[in-house]
Amino acid sequence: PGRDSFLGSQVHTNDYVDATQYGGKRVLVVGGGTSAVGFLLELEEYASELTWVSRRNVDFLDETELNMEAGTEAVARQDEAARAGRALPSIVSGTGVPRTRRIQAGIDRGLLQPKRMFERIEPHGVRWADGTYRDVDAIVWATGFRPELRHLAPLKLREKEGGIVVAAGSSWRDPRVFFAGYGPQASTIGANRAGRLIARQVIATLSKL
């Protein structure tokens, strides 16, 4: 609530350019994944004040790099949701954030200590449910990406659960429609294999025409 009333700057992950534009500013980073962590580590040198908030607890792993097993399980959950036509869960909710040396150092010096999500945004800052207020000049929304499917409405592919049933990269309702980067392909463990799969499927489909 109040997002439109904020008088400072707001950017999403895809609009973020670099940390230098936040020199001397009080910056709020919103999100609980690796993008939020990366922004905080980069902004630390330039921002006058940094605040990190997340809707959920951030799961810092004991591993120093992404655990392939956890990544595979997260992708499997994406695949299950895509096959059922449900809204897709985030990858990081299943993988957690690896505790690299740089990230551990950020934790040790108090930088990577997320606060709970604020209750509302005000023109010059944010306020929590207990009344605590913090002035903010800029907000970086590192909240991930949602599949943008509205432009596909004329194809009538969406299910009542809110998603599109996708199996092996193609629509269950219309196998001629392929979804590269959707569901289990939107992965932090690498999309090359999925990209090759889609390419082979497209070629096979075209060869039948």
Question: Where are each of the predicted segments found?
Answer:
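Flavin (primarily FAD) cofactor-binding/catalytic cores of flavoenzymes
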Residues: 1-209
